[in-house]
């Protein structure tokens, strides 16, 4: 079976800074640095990722590219007396990811739209860029779309600020432990991990039966019987 176009796009984005795609990314970053921090783009940069997250080339759906500075928080240095250790200027990083920060900034820029999802598109030594998919809940094309009309209800307003997007749920720990405990997949993975650790233990029967190749060659002369 022939591979689709999206397969080849995804393959290039596995190593985006190598080969011909790396030269293209270099030219893109040079251009993106000169642009505003929040910019509406005509088409998504990663079409495969955008389509997987719900993007559709139709009225009522837009994509905004957001630039976020890398690193932790920059806090103002206090002018009152205290030790430099207790000034609280360095070493403070927000608990939320830069991707979630990009979604929040896009939501503030377009308050009448609903953030659907976002994805990574590039970075340099100072900034990271994300593209955020936004949907207009009042557009007739969105209201008539059975896959997107769930955003038309009022309860989805301000999703990034309430941790309801994919990046927000990851920040809340719903994808790691709290939201997965009790499911069959979580229990199966936990039991499989316990079995692997039990086999690797030095006192287990399976570990005693395993002989390294060099020991087998030295003492058994290559005889496996």
UniProtKB/Swiss-Prot annotation:
Where in this protein does the record put region Disordered? Answer: 159-180
Q: Does the keyword Ribosomal protein apply?
A: yes
Q: List the coiled-coil residues.
A: none
Q: Where is the composition biased (Basic residues)?
A: 169-180
Alphabetical keyword list: Ribonucleoprotein, Ribosomal protein
Checking Gene3D superfamilies in the record gives: Ribosomal protein l15e
GO biological process terms, alphabetically, are:
cytoplasmic translation
- List GO terms (cellular component aspect): cytosolic large ribosomal subunit
Give the matching SUPFAM superfamilies. Ribosomal proteins S24e, L23 and L15e
Q: Which GO terms describe its molecular function?
A: RNA binding; structural constituent of ribosome
Tell me which InterPro entries the record gives.
Answer: Rbsml_eL15_core_dom_sf (IPR024794), Ribosomal_eL15 (IPR000439), Ribosomal_eL15_arc (IPR020926), Ribosomal_eL15_CS (IPR020925), Ribosomal_uL23/eL15/eS24_sf (IPR012678)
Q: Which family does it belong to?
A: Belongs to the eukaryotic ribosomal protein eL15 family.
PANTHER family assigned to the protein according to its UniProt record, in alphabetical order? LARGE RIBOSOMAL SUBUNIT PROTEIN EL15, RIBOSOMAL PROTEIN L15
Stated name of the protein: Large ribosomal subunit protein eL15
């Amino acid at each position: 079976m022939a591979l689709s176009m999206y397969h080849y796009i995804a393959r290039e984005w596995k190593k985006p800074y190598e080969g011909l795609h790396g030269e293209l990314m270099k030219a893109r970053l040079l251009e993106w640095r000169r642009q505003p921090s929040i910019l509406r783009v005509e088409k998504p940069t990663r079409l495969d990722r955008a389509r997987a997250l719900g993007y559709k080339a139709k009225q009522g759906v837009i994509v905004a590219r957001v630039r976020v500075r890398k690193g932790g928080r920059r806090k103002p240095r206090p002018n009152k007396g205290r030790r430099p250790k207790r000034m609280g200027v360095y070493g403070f990083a927000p608990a939320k990811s830069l991707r979630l920060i990009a979604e929040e900034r896009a939501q503030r820029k377009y308050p009448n739209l609903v953030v659907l999802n976002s994805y990574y598109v590039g970075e340099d030594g100072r900034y990271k860029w994300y593209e955020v998919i936004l949907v207009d809940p009042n557009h007739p094309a969105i209201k008539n779309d059975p896959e997107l009309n769930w955003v038309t209800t009022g309860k989805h307003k301000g999703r990034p600020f309430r941790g309801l997007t994919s990046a927000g749920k990851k920040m809340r720990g719903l994808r790691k432990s709290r939201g997965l405990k009790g499911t069959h997949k979580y229990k199966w993975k936990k039991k499989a991990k316990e079995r692997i650790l039990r086999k690797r233990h030095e006192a287990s029967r399976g570990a005693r039966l395993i002989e390294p190749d060099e020991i087998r060659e030295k003492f058994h002369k290559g005889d496996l019987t």
